[in-house]
A protein has these predicted regions:
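Alpha-helical transmembrane segments of multi-pass inner-membrane proteins
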Residues: 8, 20-25, 39-42, 72, ...
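Loop-to-helix entry and N-terminal half of a specific, functionally important transmembrane alpha helix
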Residues: 16-24, 71, 214-216, 330, ...
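Transmembrane alpha-helices of multi-pass inner-membrane enzymes
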Residues: 18, 41-47, 238, 258, ...
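Transmembrane alpha-helical segments and their membrane-water interfaces
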Residues: 26, 46-55, 79-143, 385
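A membrane-periplasm/extracellular boundary helix in multi-pass inner-membrane enzymes
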Residues: 73, 135, 139, 225, ...
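A conserved mid-to-late transmembrane alpha helix and its immediate loop/hinge
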Residues: 176, 219, 292-295, 301, ...
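Hydrophobic transmembrane alpha-helices and their immediate junctions
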Residues: 208, 250, 343-382
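Long extracytoplasmic/lumenal interhelical loops at the membrane interface
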Residues: 271-272, 277-292, 304-343
């Protein structure tokens, strides 16, 4: 869609959308409740735009939105189906069932982004927020945290007291403002993609320099959080970014930096211990137990599943036979397996369709030069890596962080990576005249 064909937008609506997106960006580093409120507001604004027939979406974005809505609808209905088929004995907890909103959050971000996106504001909020969070994480890593936040924030102080070092030389788990090392580290993977895209693709040296600091801060935060899967995902995403965005000396320099990070991990006693435990965790440990129970649920209810949000009670029903405990029963420690266990083959196919359509739309925009799409595509790669060993939607702040990045990757005016746009095809929304302003 050419930008000249866009209808005039109410300035008040532009301000509302800018406020929602900025609030969402703040939540990426601050608190889960912030991203939940922002995502809910985005869904509401998207519904208003659709009701007013004001949405103008590219065909591939429209397909992604439709797939997201279809998956959300099935998630909403699946507990009732599970009750009717006898696969479940009760309705899921409201907090877990309410996470259906997260499924359409990325689509909502893409929809409201058609009104306009304050790119520099969002970039400044995310970059500044992550630099501050990195500093806080460094302090948490070295000093046993003593200040207890108000109960209203529902932050678990004990998560910051996990010592991965020794009594003589303690190394505590960084949790940033989330006070939770996995929320902190997995959220970093969501935002790492855009930072790498700016670092490798921006034409302005100052922006590349700032993006470089943010990338180093995120890598340091993941290192200090002792998050093994997140570190592996960060390395993979960084290598993909180097292959996509830079060549020659720049690529070699990037590989050297990653090599130094790997060396630091190897020489760290705390990290060596963490990596040694990872092997036992996958082969015969807690993660293998959780996955085996997930597969058992799939075998028992392959088509419709046990109902969205019902993995825990269904898994606990096997406790006497499998030995699963309350902590491990929450999910199958794998996104795809948990989706299959909860929503059956129907939900799995819808979930796969949604991600394939998202990836296709992002790849097309990356090839046409969209900076935001490139960052979102890298973020999508990180999500898929983490999804192999974690059920990321369990932490809404993590899932909604990815959703915001993906939605923005489908929006207009995201800038270009290369100096010129291919002339063989019409200008897409993401690289139209507004993108160069």
């Amino acid at each position: 869609m050419d930008s000249t064909s866009q209808p005039l937008v109410d300035p008040r609506l532009r301000r509302v959308v800018a406020g929602v997106l900025a609030f969402w960006a703040v939540g990426l580093v601050l608190a889960e409740v912030v991203v939940q409120v922002a995502a809910g507001a985005a869904v509401l604004v998207a519904i208003i735009l659709a009701a007013r027939r004001s949405l103008r979406l590219a065909p591939d974005v429209r397909a992604y939105v439709a797939a997201s809505l279809a998956l959300c609808a099935w998630q909403l209905a699946s507990p009732a189906v599970a009750l009717l088929t006898g696969a479940a004995q009760r309705w899921p907890r409201s907090s877990r069932y309410g996470q259906v909103l997260d499924t359409v959050a990325g689509a909502a971000a893409a929809c409201i982004g058609t009104v306009g996106v304050p790119w520099l504001l969002l970039a400044g909020v995310v970059a500044g927020g992550w630099l501050v969070a990195t500093g806080l994480g460094m302090l948490q890593n070295r000093v046993r945290w003593s200040w207890e936040p108000p109960a209203f924030f529902k932050l678990n102080l004990s998560r910051l007291h996990e010592n991965f070092g020794t009594e003589e030389s303690p190394r505590y788990a960084s949790g940033g403002f989330f006070f939770h090392r996995l929320r902190f580290a997995h959220g970093a993977i969501a935002a790492l993609g855009p930072a790498l895209a700016v670092l490798g693709g921006s034409e302005l040296a100052r922006r590349r320099g700032l993006a470089g600091l943010v990338v180093l801060g995120m890598l340091l935060s993941i290192y200090n959080a002792f998050a093994r899967a997140a570190l592996g995902a960060a390395l993979i995403v960084s290598v993909v970014a180097l292959l996509l965005l830079v060549q020659g000396r720049a690529r070699k320099a990037g590989l050297v930096v990653l090599g130094v990070l790997v060396l630091v991990v190897v020489v760290s006693p705390a990290w060596r211990a963490r990596m040694a435990k990872a092997v036992g965790n996958i082969y015969g440990g807690e993660r293998q137990l959780a996955m085996s129970v997930g597969w058992e649920l799939v075998r028992e209810h392959p088509l419709a599943g046990v109902g969205f949000g019902n993995h825990k009670p269904a898994a606990m029903a096997t406790a006497e036979r499998t030995g699963i405990n309350d902590f491990l029963a929450t999910d199958a420690h794998n996104v795809w397996l948990t989706v299959w266990a909860e929503t059956g083959l129907v939900g799995l196919l819808l979930f796969a369709c949604m991600h394939v359509l998202l990836a296709r739309a992002l790849i097309r925009r990356h090839r046409e030069g969209s900076l935001a799409a490139t960052g979102a595509l890298l973020s999508w790669v990180g999500f898929q890596v983490l999804a192999l060993v974690h059920y990321l939607p369990f932490h809404s702040n993590v899932h909604l962080s990815f959703a915001l990045i993906w939605g923005l990757g489908l929006c207009e005016g995201s800038g270009v990576l290369r100096g010129e746009t291919p002339a063989a095809s019409p200008l897409p929304a993401s690289v139209g005249p507004a993108a160069r302003s």
